[in-house]
């Protein structure tokens, strides 16, 4: 009877460990634009957020920029691309990817050395963020960096398209998809008669990936439990 109870306990522990959600944290990673210039770097053991973005290097197209927003509660970096479609101030925005995303179905963005796992948002999905998220956008008049509380830009577009926002808890679970991990938009210079929109995947470098090795800790804990159960049988 005692052996049966121990076996049941081991099965319960195994199921609990198998269903545990792995959350990814990133000590250091950087984002490069289509011209292979580093425009954002998150350094280990610092509080770097979107205020550290080199917005001039992230600029794409005509009057556009990449925007990186970090939620202090959810600790998620949301990468967006703001580009002017006709160089007149009319802007469009598109969510590229969210990193890190505590979703089991997170996709992998491979770099030269390591792999970082981020979640992508479907086009029609909502961005779950907290009230304290910060935004950095490119000022088209004087190229200065500004902080804004949400995802809206200060321009008055004819038909703006901004992601929906709402409040979320600390661990927001965003729906992921395996397509379009990142995209960038380019606009032709003024000398051309029309603008061209190209969607490319910006490179992402990650020097140190998963900061907390949840898998190894769970495996160690399971071995200790099994050893104690086996020892109790003798």
Swiss-Prot record:
Name of protein: Ponticulin-like protein J
Signal sequence bounds: 1-20
Positions annotated with a glycan in the UniProt record: 19, 143, 166, 206, 213
Subcellular location: Cell membrane
Protein's membrane topology: Lipid-anchor; GPI-anchor
Propeptide: 213-234
The protein's role, per its UniProt record: Binds F-actin and nucleates actin assembly.
Main location: membrane
Region annotation (Disordered) ranges: 115-213
Family named by the database record: Belongs to the ponticulin family.
Superkingdom of the organism of origin: Eukaryota
Keywords: Actin-binding, Cell membrane, Glycoprotein, GPI-anchor, Lipoprotein, Membrane, Signal
GO molecular function per UniProt: actin binding
Post-translational modification (record): The GPI-like-anchor contains a phosphoceramide group, rather than a phosphatidyl group.
GO cellular-component term (any): side of membrane
Keyword Nucleus listed: no
Lipidation (GPI-like-anchor amidated asparagine): 212
Compositional bias per record (Low complexity), positions renumbered to this chain: 154-195
